[in-house]
Structure formats: structure tokens, C-alpha cells
Amino acid sequence: TIAEQVGLSHTPCWRRIKRLQESGVISANVALVNAKKVGLGVVVFVTVKLNSHDEQILAQFESAAVAMDEVMQCYIMSGDVDYLLRVVVQSIEQYEQTLKRKLVNLPGVAALNSSFALRELKNQHLLPWQLVSTGNLQH
């Protein structure tokens, strides 16, 4: 159990977990589903350039992009592109339809570039705790 691993009894451990959840350090408890096993084996990284950096356009794009079921992650980027999306679909054909029907119609899109992942080498969900200051966890 977690309590045994951290050297606490059950009740203090549970209280600590609750405090970490309430403070936002623990943001969710989830079961990770293997995308390939459920038929979503095509991963596409899409870079997006917008035609304007007007706050309204940015807000509209972000709202529409994060509402898309196919978009697993959306990052605001520095550098040559404005956003990076990680998209999952069943097939290249399905991605083509997503591109034509949804992505190109997102507000403010000037250019899209799609890169298909050939194979996943690492997809880690555990944080590198050795890099975290323990002072940050005093919640």
C-alpha cells in the first residue's frame, strides 16, 4: 500500500493524500487505457500557426481545440509555431477526415503541419520525483 511505502499508518496517509488533492498537487486519479488496444493506434502531432495573436482569436482557438475529442493534449508553444496538438485516431483515413472537417476550420488557423508517430518509445506518467523539491509538497 501507499501507506507502507511512505512509512505512515493508513489514516495519516489518507489525510495527506486528501490534502494533496485539495491543494491541487494531485490533480486526478485515473486508469490509463492502452489506446492501441481500443483501436486508437494512430498518433499525430499537429503544429498550428494562427493568422492573428488577438486575444479573442486565441481564446476561440483554444476553446475549440480543447473541445475536440481527438485532441489529447494541447500546448501553447514558443518559437515558430503557436500550438502543438497531440491527436489520436483509428486510421490515417480518419485523420484525413478530422483534418478536413475540424482542424482546418478551427478559429484563426493559418497553417497546420501534421507529423505521424511511427512508434512510441516512452510515454511516462510518473513525475521525476528526484527533481522535485520536497518543500513544494508541504500542503
Which residues does each predicted region cover?
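A compositional/biophysical signature of low hydrophobicity enriched in polar/charged and small residues
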Residues: T1-H139
